[in-house]
Each structure stands twice: as C-alpha cells, then as structure tokens.
C-alpha cells in the first residue's frame, strides 16, 4: 500500500485560516432612540434602565443626549437582541401612550 500525499489541511489552507473562516463575529447593530415632543424624560430613563440595563447615571446621560441632539445610542447588540429591544421599547411606549421611536443601525466594521 502506498502512502497518500493528500493532506486536507494543506489543500484547504492553514488551521488558523480554517478557524477564521468558520468563526466570524456577528454583525452588530446600534439601537437608536429618537427624540419627540411627547415622551417624558422620566419614561426614557426608565426604558433605558429596564430594557437596556443602564444605571441611573448612564440612562440620564443617554436621555439628555437624545433630548439635545435628537438621537442617541441606547446600546450595541447582535441583530436578534437589538430587534427584541426595539420591539419591547415600542410595546412599552405604546402601552404608556408615548410615541417613542427606536431604530437599528448596522455598526460599520
């Protein structure tokens, strides 16, 4: 029997390259809060604390950024988690009678 010269690692590339090809970081998305003239600052802070797990200080800082700039980043997450947070925010805002708007934006790599 002769020894085969076929080596799948050599044919396909180095182990490091194979690992890099198999394990890719998921795309990340910013969850953006948009300012409006009706949603209270207190409600925005409560959403940031409950849904986005921010401290009171972090939530207040983000809320003030949204208020002053018209938009602010609530957090950066994988797509599925970001979509869940957006949907939960919209549901709670509707239940409370607020038009708070929340959107996703893909993070550039």
Swiss-Prot record:
Signal peptide start and end residues: none
GO annotation, biological process: protein catabolic process; proteolysis
Stored InterPro entries: ClpS, ClpS_core, Ribosomal_bL12_C/ClpS-like
SUPFAM superfamilies xref list: ClpS-like
Gene3D superfamilies xrefs: 3.30.1390.10
Description of how the protein assembles with itself and partners: Binds to the N-terminal domain of the chaperone ClpA.
Alphabetical list of HAMAP family matching this protein: ClpS
Recorded family membership: Belongs to the ClpS family.
Function per UniProt: Involved in the modulation of the specificity of the ClpAP-mediated ATP-dependent protein degradation.
Protein name, UniProt field: ATP-dependent Clp protease adapter protein ClpS
Protein species of origin: Lawsonia intracellularis (strain PHE/MN1-00)
Higher taxonomy: Bacteria, Pseudomonadati, Thermodesulfobacteriota, Desulfovibrionia, Desulfovibrionales
């Amino acid at each position: 029997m002769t020894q085969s010269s076929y080596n799948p690692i050599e044919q396909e590339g180095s182990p490091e390259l194979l690992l890099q090809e198999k394990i890719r970081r998921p795309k990340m998305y910013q969850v953006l809060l948009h300012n409006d003239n009706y949603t209270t600052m207190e409600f925005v802070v409560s959403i940031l604390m409950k849904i986005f797990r921010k401290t009171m200080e972090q939530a207040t800082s983000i809320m003030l950024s949204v208020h002053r700039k018209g938009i602010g980043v609530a957090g950066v997450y994988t797509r599925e988690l970001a979509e869940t947070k957006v949907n939960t925010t919209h549901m709670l805002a509707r239940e409370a009678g607020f038009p708070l708007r929340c959107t996703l934006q893909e993070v550039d790599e």
